[in-house]
Amino acid sequence: MKLSFTKMQGCANDYIYLDCRASGVPENIAALSEKLSRRHFSIGADGIICICAPRTAGADAMMRIFNADGSEGKMCGNGIRCVAEWLYTHGIAKETLAIDTLSGLKTVTHQGAGLWQVEMGAYSAMPADLPAVNMGEDALVNKVLTVDGKVWQVTCISVGNPHCVTVVEDVDSLKLEQIGPGFEHHANFPERINTEFVQVVDATHLKMRVWERGSGETWACGTGTCATVAAVTELGICPAGEDIHVQLRGGVLTIRVLPGKQLLMTGAAETVCEGTTEV
């Protein structure tokens, strides 16, 4: 059977996008995501994002995210910008789009020429919202976490999916393929966790790398960038209410923390190619 797809990327966080609005999500989507995401052997991507018919009144579409290991994610910040760009170029040319996710309805606004701003909603540092266990009941800001025998200072943030953020001196020197799995599968995070390693350049500029649950190190993570800015704001490193520019391996995202812990994310979305593949 031939399957039509669009490959898109936001800050090099690349996914295979499927139009499932009429057909629904394929029954074998987990296996399909594993197969098609394999770099060098297939299309290659961080996973598959299905663009589905909306399930919520007022939504233009719904997105479902499947990681490279077949597991389903709740939200993808880079992915939602690409969904907006796909809809915009495939017949829903609205300047403001409402996209449903497993983390709720998100508003995405066109900023011109492939640039989109996403209202990501409010973040939380409370253990129950991640979830996290054995870390106390108060906000998970500047906590101690021992990973594979090494002690880290971490701040844990939920932005609809869970993140563990740690500030480091030199992010480029880290061997994430050795460090990341210990965070992802730590017993304190029963649903696994995404981990961000951030280097502070100055009060409005950060440099970050990410280890995503289910995908390993990726070149960017929109929700992870939001969680990182939320964390350093909680720590008093960066100011709320100002644009914070985060350099990722794949590009730059701009995040702002608004009153009520609301987050705004601005970044690009680009179509890489379109095609069909045998499945």
Regions found by a protein language model. Give the residues of each.
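Active-site glycine-rich loop that binds ribose-phosphate moieties when present
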Residues: 124-153
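A glycine-rich beta-to-alpha transition motif near the start of alpha/beta enzyme domains, typified by
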Residues: 1-113, 165-279
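Intrinsically disordered, low-complexity regions enriched in acidic/Ser/Thr/Pro/Gln residues
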Residues: 116-118
